[in-house]
From Swiss-Prot:
One of its GO terms (cellular component) is extracellular region. Belongs to the peptidase C26 family. InterPro entries: Class_I_gatase-like (IPR029062), Pept_C26_g-glut_hydrolase (IPR015527), Peptidase_C26 (IPR011697). It comes from Arabidopsis thaliana. This is Probable gamma-glutamyl hydrolase 3. The lineage of its organism: Eukaryota, Viridiplantae, Streptophyta, Embryophyta, Tracheophyta. Its EC number is 3.4.19.9.
Length: 352
């Protein structure tokens, strides 16, 4: 008897499975009425035409920084060494950030002859000023010259974005404020923080515009961004400087380890210029510090920041010859793995 019952249960299972399988149809197996449902879902997609107002092969120029990327107790001797040897570098995480958004990179070697440097600037659709320590000397002067040239391009009608991070934020603040002493000391080295959106801020046209609402909430409640700087600007001092307050809107602030508030994200009111005191590139691409956030939410912050950078660069109509671009791309250089040495960056491009 039990065998008979077992047989019936198997038979019932097989019939149910067959019916279930038969309920799954390919488009060619359904009737005319049902086929209309599939037609409404566009099973025969039409590829959209390219937008003539967008550049689908954007190139980002990244300015090199003096030195080899090492960051330790010998900082002052490293500064002297860097300037004496003419060595410069780019942390590979900045390159990967641009590539994540769909762009290629051309290194802008800061101590090359100015004529060559500005020839390369004509090959790119946007510029990144990276983190580092060089706030004086040739490096500062080169950042200022490039920034002024970029502003001329924008004033002439060319959309040319700037992305400035950490040191880049600080130097732009010094340049625009016309005050090299504008920076203040903060206890904000090597730690993760939240971002607090500034009062009455409108995030439209900012890096945060396309962030999902849930991620925007988490930015203010969780430690999703990496801070690594000794200097910054308080909101009061920022707003108290007429040049800064007329050029930039404060988008976010953050607090250091002593709960002192500093400006952490700014966006130009008129130009495609965004500056971060924090490091959007580190979450996904740097592993040397245990403080760097690597959660899925933190990685999304990096991805959205990269997408924004490149979406701005796509608006640039600068389209130089392919041959000139290819011969200057960073693919012509080899990165050096330096993470095992305890460097501040896992991977760097070194230029000698």
């Amino acid at each position: 008897m039990w065998r008979f019952c077992f047989f019936l249960s198997l038979l019932f299972f097989d019939v149910s499975a067959v019916k279930s399988a038969e309920s799954i149809f390919l488009p060619s197996q359904i009737g005319v009425e049902d086929s209309r449902v599939f037609e409404s879902l566009s099973l025969s997609p039409v590829c959209s035409a390219a937008d003539p107002n967008l550049n689908y092969k954007p190139v980002i120029g990244i300015l090199t920084h003096p030195g080899e990327g090492r960051w330790d107790a010998r900082l002052h001797s490293l500064k002297n060494y860097a300037y004496a040897t003419n060595i410069s570098y780019i942390a590979a995480s900045y390159v990967k950030l641009a590539e994540t958004g769909g762009a290629r990179v051309i290194p802008l070697i800061y101590n090359e002859p100015e004529e060559i440097l500005f020839q390369k600037l004509e090959l790119v659709n946007g510029v990144i000023f990276t983190g580092g320590w060089a706030k004086t000397g040739l490096y500062y002067d080169v950042v200022e010259k490039i920034f002024n040239k970029v502003m001329e391009k924008n004033d002439a009608g060319e959309h040319f974005p700037v992305y400035a991070m950490c040191l880049g934020f600080e130097i732009l603040s010094m340049i625009i404020s016309q005050n090299r002493d504008i920076l203040e000391r903060f206890n904000s080295v090597n730690y993760a923080s939240s971002l607090q959106f500034f009062k009455n801020v409108n995030i439209e046209a900012t890096v945060f515009q396309r962030f999902p609402p849930e991620l925007l909430k988490k930015l203010s409640a969780d430690c999703l961004v990496m801070q690594n700087h000794y200097f910054g600007i308080s909101p009061d001092n920022f707003q108290g400087n007429p040049y800064l307050s007329s050029f930039f809107n404060i988008v976010t602030t953050s607090a250091d380890k002593d709960s002192k508030t500093f400006v952490s994200t700014i966006r130009s009111k008129r130009y495609p210029v965004t500056a971060f005191q924090w490091h959007p590139e580190k979450n996904a691409f740097e592993w040397g510090s245990s403080e760097i956030p690597h959660s899925e939410d933190a990685i999304q912050v990096t991805q959205h920041a990269a997408n924004y950078l490149v979406s701005e660069a796509r608006k640039s109509m600068n389209r130089p010859s392919s041959e000139k671009v290819l011969s200057n791309l960073i693919y012509n250089y080899k990165p050096t793995y330096s993470g095992y040495k305890g460097s501040g960056d896992d991977e760097v491009y070194i230029f000698t």
